[in-house]
Regions:
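Acidic/glycine-rich phosphate/pyrophosphate-binding loops and surrounding catalytic core
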Residues: 2-146
Length: 146
């Protein structure tokens, strides 16, 4: 089960690994008061997953960042569809974006592949289940999207 505690722990670890001193390039080149509005846009068709983790990546980086989800967890989306809108201090948005994208891409990919398997066994007695064979430290988020 993906709890808020699990999400916070995973996101904080990812931020500490990716940007332990902040995002130095942004801090050196972007004014502190600059704001940014951007969107998480799908490159291909899929199933949305990881919205809570995306939100946490931005909000834990800077509480002034707002994330508006445009796709609900577990819903199908099409290429080019906006899945979320992110707005806030540019430095914070840019610091968190790689972490948020990494989680979103991986979680959406797992949810999309799982949906394909579920569709493939529809009408049979087969069931699709998850496994414990996952990425160390990221088991909960990987299993939550199956």
């Amino acid at each position: 089960m993906l709890t808020q505690c699990t999400i916070t722990t995973a996101v904080r670890a990812a931020l500490a690994e990716d940007a332990p001193w902040g995002y130095i390039t942004s801090e050196a080149t972007i004014p502190a008061d600059a704001r940014l509005r951007t969107a998480l846009t799908a490159r291909e068709d899929g199933v949305f997953a990881g919205g809570q983790v995306v939100r946490a990546a931005f909000e834990l980086t800077d509480p002034a960042i707002t994330v508006t989800e445009l796709a609900a967890e577990g819903t199908r989306f099409t290429a080019g569809q906006q899945l979320a809108v992110i707005e806030g201090p540019a430095r914070g948005v840019l610091t968190a974006e790689r972490i948020a994208l990494n989680f979103a891409q991986r979680m959406c990919a797992i949810a999309t592949l799982t949906a394909r398997y579920v569709d493939a066994v529809a009408g049979t007695n087969a069931r699709i289940v998850d496994t414990r064979k996952t990425t160390p430290g990221l088991r909960a988020d990987r299993k939550s999207v199956v």
